[in-house]
Amino acid sequence: MEIKHDYNVQLFKEKGFIRKQCKECNQYFWTLDPKRETCGDSPCDEYSFIGSSITNKEYTYNEMVKEFLNFFDKNGHTPIKRYPVSARRWRDDILLTIASIAVFQPWVTKGIVKPVANPLVIAQPCIRLNDIDNVGRTGRHMTCFTMGGHHAFNTDEDFKYWTDRTVELCYNFFTNLGIDGSSITFIESWWEGGGNAGPCYEVITHGVELATLVFMQYEKTEQGDYIEMPLKIVDTGYGLERFVWASKGTPTVYEAVFGDIIGKLMDDANINMNDIGPKILAESATLAGLMDIENVGDLRILRQKVAEKLNLDVNELDSILSPIENIYAIADHTRCLAFMLGDGIVPSNVKDGYLARLLVRKTLRYIKNVGLSLSLKDIVAMQLENLKEIYPELMDMKEYIMDVLEEEENKYIQTITKGKGAVERIAKSKDEITLDDLIELYDSKGLPPEVVRDIVEEINKKGSKNNKGNKTIKITVPDNFYTIVAERHEEKKEDSKSEKGENTAEKSTISINLDDIPETELLFYSNPYQKEVEAKILKIIGNVVILDKTVFYPEGGGQKYDIGLIGNKKIISVQKNNNGIVCHTVENTDGLNEEDTIIAKLNWENRLNLMRNHTATHIINAAASKVLGKHIWQTGSNVESNKARLDITHYKRITREEIKEIEKIANQIVLDAIPVKSTVMGRNEAEQKYGFKIYQGGVVPGNILRILDIEGVDVEACGGTHCQNTSEVGYIKILKTERIQDGVERLEYTSGINSVNEVSLMEDILLNASSIVGVPCENLPKTVNRFFEEWKEQKKIIEELHKKIGELEKGNLNDKFEKVGKYDLLVEKVEGAPKELMSIADNLVNEKDNSIVILLNNSGYILCKCGEKVEIKMGELLRKIAKGGGKDKMAQGKCADDIETLKSKVVGEL
C-alpha cells in the first residue's frame, strides 16, 4: 500500500522553495536555489563548510545545547531534563537510549500516558554503537551524540502543530544561527520503525545532514498496510554536535566538540599537526565524508580513494591518519563512557554492561596504539570536567567512574595475559582463525581481535610446535568487527541468570479461559493485615477456585504466593491471569461448589514472613546503594517465607566489611521505626517526583503505579505485600553473597524470627567446633589456624614419603617388565592409594618411553600409563580390560579381576 504525502508546506510556498530531483541519487528535495541540481547530502555533495564557519559565530558544545533549548523554549516548548543513556531504567525492549523519541516510548507514544509537557524540547544524549567502527575514520560518526528534539503529541481534541510549523521552526533555527537559507535543502523521505511510519524531511546544508523531521502518523500492520494513528507525533532529531562542527568548520566533528582534549592527547602522543599539513588533513576529512564502512566494508578500499586524491601511497596515508583516528576515537569513546558509567551502567558480560566493557577495552587498545602516558581514567576525568556545566550529575558519580575504570583496566590486563593459551589451542587444530572464532574469543575470553592477531603473528613467527610444524595460521580482522559484535548484543533478548524468571516486574500468570468472570477484588492492598474473608466461589475449574475477593497474594513481583485455606482445602498455588483474575489452586475441590460462600483464611505466619522479607529487600537495596554507590541497580529478587535474595549490579565482589556495613545500616533503618507508605499515582507524577529509581524492581506497565515509600530510605513501584513500619521487619541478617554473573552480586538474607534462628544455628556450629577442638570460642580462629599450618606440614611430609615409596617400588618393579610385541609391558598389583600408584607409574614410564605400565591396588583401582613412543591410547585400552576411561597417555578406573586375569586380558589386546 503506497501512501502519498504532500511535502509542500506553508514555508516553502511563502519563501519560494522549489521542488527538484537530485541528478545523482534521484531523491526529491526542496531548495531556494534554482541552480541547484543535487540534494546537498553526501555523497552527492562534498562537505563545503570545512575551513570556514557557516554560522554567525563559533559555538562550543555547551553553548549549542543551551542555544537549542532556549530557541524552542522561546517558541512555546517546555524544556525537560534528559533521560539516562541506559534505556533499561524505564523500558525493557532496548538497552541504550538511541533517540530523543525513545524516552517517550512506549507509554506516551501509545497514548497510555500523557507527555510531561506538550509541546516539549529535550537535548538527549544518545548512544548508538552500530557505527562504532566508523568513529574516528569518517570525521562525522560518534558513539555518543546529543539529539535535540522538539516533540508535539497531537490528538483530535488537543492538536498542537504538524508539518507546517515543524518545518518553519527548523528553518528559523538554522537561519537564526546564521546559516544561509539558500544553502538548506529539505529532502523528501519516509521513516519506518517500531511498527510506526510517516513522512519525513532530511535537512541538509553544505553536504552534511543536521536534522531529521519525522511525522509519525501511521501504524504498519503485519500485512504491510498503514493505519492512521489516533496520536500523531512530531518526532524531530537535531544533531547538536554536527551544528557545533558546522559552526567551527574544523576538518572533523571531533576537533569541534573535543578540541581541548584532542590537543592534550596529540601533545601526549607527540603527534605534531604541522607535520601532517592542514591541506592533507582537510582533504582527507572531506573525502572521508563519503566513506561508509557499513556499505563498503573494507577500509583499505576507502583509504585507496583518499590516497589517490591526495597523491599519496596508501601505506603512507595510513601511517599519517591512523594515529590521529585513534586519538579521535579515544576522545569520542571516553565521553560515551562518562555518560554510560555516570548513569550507573556497570561493565559486565551481558546487556548494556557488555557494551560498556566493549567500549572500555577498545579505548584501552587505542591508548596503547598511540603510546599515551595519560590513562583512561585521566581522559574520562577531562570529559567529566567539560560536561559538568550541563550535566553536573555526572560529576557526582566521579568516584565510582574512576574506581570502575581502574577495575576494568586491571581485568583487561589479566585477560590479555591469560588469552594466549586460548588462541594457541584454536591455532593447534585449525589453519584459520575465523570471524566466529574472533567473536567467541571476544565474548568468552574478552580478547580483542587485534590482540588475537598479534598472538597469531607471534605463533607464525615462532613456527610453534603447537601448530603442527611451520604452517601459517590465517587471520583476517574485519574493519567493522566491533559493529558486528555490538549489534549482536544490542539485539539479544535472552534473560540473564539474575533476571530469568525472577524479574521483579514480572507477574506469574495462569492461562484459563475466564472471559465471563469479573476481576478479583484484592483485599491485601487495602489491608495487608486482614487474615481472612468471607468470599463467594465464582468458578471451579479442576482444582482451580475463583473467588469474588481474596486475601491471598498471587505470585508476582519476585514474591512467593500466599498459602492458607479455602474452606478446609489447602492452597498449593495462587496465580493471577492477565485480566486481573486470581486463580487459587487447592489440593482438591471435594465439597466446594460454585456460588458457595466460604471462609478464605491466610496462613498468617507465612504472610508475615513474606511481608518482612519483602520490606527487608527494599531496605537492603537502599543500604547497599549507600555503602557501594549510586550505581547499584536491582536486577532481580526472590522473596520467600524463610529467606529472600536480592541481585544487584556491582563491578567487584562485595567485601566482608561492606556486608557488615550494609547489615548495620539496614538494622538501623529497622530500629528507626520508619512508616512504610503505599500510594497510587500517575506514571509521570511518580517519575518527576522520585526519578527512575522507582523501577529498581523492573519496568512496570501502565499509567497508574503503586508506589511504596520508606521515607528517606527507598521509593519503588512495587505490587508486593509489606509491613507498615520498618520496626515490624525485625532483625535483618545477611547470610551470604555470591557473584552469579560478571557485574551482578546476589545477597541472601533473612528477617525477623528467621534471622534469630539463623544466628542461633551459627552459634551452635561455633560451640560444637569449640567443643571438638577443646578451646573457648574466642580462641577458635587462632587454634584452627595452627591446626591448618600443622596439617600443611604433615601433608608435605606425606608427599615426600609417597615419592620415596614410589622410588623404592620403581626399583622393585623395573625388573618385572616383559616384552610384548614392540612394547615393554608391566602389569602388577601394588599396595597404595591412587596418588601413590600415579607417582610409581610416572617414575617408570619416564625412564622407558616405549613402556606400558598397568597397576592395580587392593581396592580395585586400576591405572594405565604409557611412554611417549607408545601409539596405543590408554583410554581405549582401559575400556577394553576394565571399567573407566582417560586420555591417550593415562587412564584410570575400576577392575574386579585378579592380577593374572588382568594380565591375560592386556596381552590379548596388545
UniProtKB/Swiss-Prot annotation:
CC cofactor: Zn(2+)
InterPro entries reported for this sequence: aa-tRNA-synth_II/BPL/LPL, Ala-tRNA-lgiase_IIc, Ala-tRNA-ligase_IIc_anticod-bd, Ala-tRNA-synth_IIc_core, Ala-tRNA-synth_IIc_N, Ala-tRNA_lgiase_arc, Ala-tRNA_ligase, DHHA1_dom
EC identifiers of the protein: 6.1.1.7
Gene Ontology terms, MF aspect: alanine-tRNA ligase activity; aminoacyl-tRNA deacylase activity; ATP binding; tRNA binding; zinc ion binding
Biological process terms in GO annotation: alanyl-tRNA aminoacylation
Superkingdom of the organism of origin: Archaea
Keywords from the named record: Aminoacyl-tRNA synthetase, ATP-binding, Cytoplasm, Ligase, Metal-binding, Nucleotide-binding, Protein biosynthesis, RNA-binding, tRNA-binding, Zinc
Composition bias, Basic and acidic residues: 488-505
Chain residues that bind Zn(2+): 614, 618, 718, 722
Catalyzed reactions per annotation: tRNA(Ala) + L-alanine + ATP = L-alanyl-tRNA(Ala) + AMP + diphosphate
Subcellular location: Cytoplasm
Region (Disordered): 488-507
GO CC, alphabetical: cytoplasm
Main location: cytoplasm
Role description: Catalyzes the attachment of alanine to tRNA(Ala) in a two-step reaction: alanine is first activated by ATP to form Ala-AMP and then transferred to the acceptor end of tRNA(Ala). Also edits incorrectly charged Ser-tRNA(Ala) and Gly-tRNA(Ala) via its editing domain.
Family: Belongs to the class-II aminoacyl-tRNA synthetase family.
Record remark on domains: Consists of three domains; the N-terminal catalytic domain, the editing domain and the C-terminal C-Ala domain. The editing domain removes incorrectly charged amino acids, while the C-Ala domain, along with tRNA(Ala), serves as a bridge to cooperatively bring together the editing and aminoacylation centers thus stimulating deacylation of misacylated tRNAs.
Protein name (record): Alanine--tRNA ligase
Gene name linked to the record: alaS
